[in-house]
Swiss-Prot record:
GO terms for biological process: ribosomal small subunit biogenesis; translation. The lineage of its organism: Eukaryota, Viridiplantae, Streptophyta, Embryophyta, Tracheophyta. It is found in: Plastid, Chloroplast. The keyword Ribosomal protein applies. Residues 89-149 form the S4 RNA-binding domain. It comes from Asparagus maritimus (Sea asparagus). GO terms for cellular component: chloroplast; small ribosomal subunit. It holds the Pfam family S4. Transmembrane segments: none annotated. The keyword rRNA-binding applies. This is Small ribosomal subunit protein uS4c. One of its GO terms (molecular function) is rRNA binding. InterPro entries: Ribosomal_uS4 (IPR022801), Ribosomal_uS4_bac-type (IPR005709), Ribosomal_uS4_CS (IPR018079), Ribosomal_uS4_N (IPR001912), S4_RNA-bd (IPR002942), S4_RNA-bd_sf (IPR036986). PANTHER family: 30S 40S RIBOSOMAL PROTEIN, SMALL RIBOSOMAL SUBUNIT PROTEIN US4M. It comes from the Eukaryota.
Length: 196
């Protein structure tokens, strides 16, 4: 299956808020699901919706998600926690969490168009796995800095996770450590994703 490129708002209405997919929010009442049509959800549907939330939030294909689940299963610790840590340490997600891009697809585009340097080297792979002590900067070109500047200026100033620090004047971000589970920006039950 290829990456989802269809209407994003339909997915948000179905699955709830996905901050990585788009910055739009459903209006209270009219855009929400019809409350009169409350059908009991099967266990399969609950697990599928949790998996789809994860997929659409991080912009993954089915195969990429399966590969991350296999890697997380082989690692020490809780498979669900390790899975979320792997996804949070992707370069496109780090850019989104730093505020250098308004959405994860926007961060993917910045990386693909070679605007981002990791430790002084151009990285054009959005799924690049960042490590603690990595320094993420923009190219010295004016166009690259202008793109990042508009994103930083327009992004809502949410609390930055404790595993990241940003210097918005030098357009530089630093990864301090691997993310703690309480700082993950998506409300999800990762055990249901692993069980699926």
């Amino acid at each position: 299956m290829s990456r989802y490129r269809g209407p994003r708002f339909k997915k948000i209405r179905r699955l709830g808020a996905l901050p990585g997919l788009t910055s739009k929010r459903p209006r209270s009442g009219s855009d929400l699901k019809n409350p009169l049509r409350s059908v009991k959800k099967s266990q399969y549907r609950i697990r599928l919706e949790e998996k789809q939330k994860l997929r659409f939030h991080y912009g993954l294909t089915e195969r990429q998600l399966l590969r991350y689940v296999h890697i997380a299963g082989k690692a020490k610790g809780s498979t669900g926690q390790v899975l979320l840590q792997l996804l949070e340490m992707r370069l496109d997600n780090i850019l989104f969490r730093l505020g250098m891009a308004s959405t994860i697809p926007g961060a993917r585009q910045l990386v693909n168009h070679r605007h981002i340097l990791v430790n002084g080297r151009i990285v054009d792979i959005p799924s690049y796995r960042c490590k603690p002590r990595d320094i993420i900067t923009t190219k010295d070109k004016q166009r690259s800095k202008a793109l990042i500047q508009t994103s930083i200026a327009s992004s809502p100033h949410e609390e930055l996770p404790n595993h990241l620090t940003i210097d918005s004047f030098q357009y530089k971000g630093l990864i301090n450590q691997i993310i703690d589970s309480k700082w993950i920006g998506l409300k999800i039950n990762e055990l249901l994703v692993v069980e699926y």
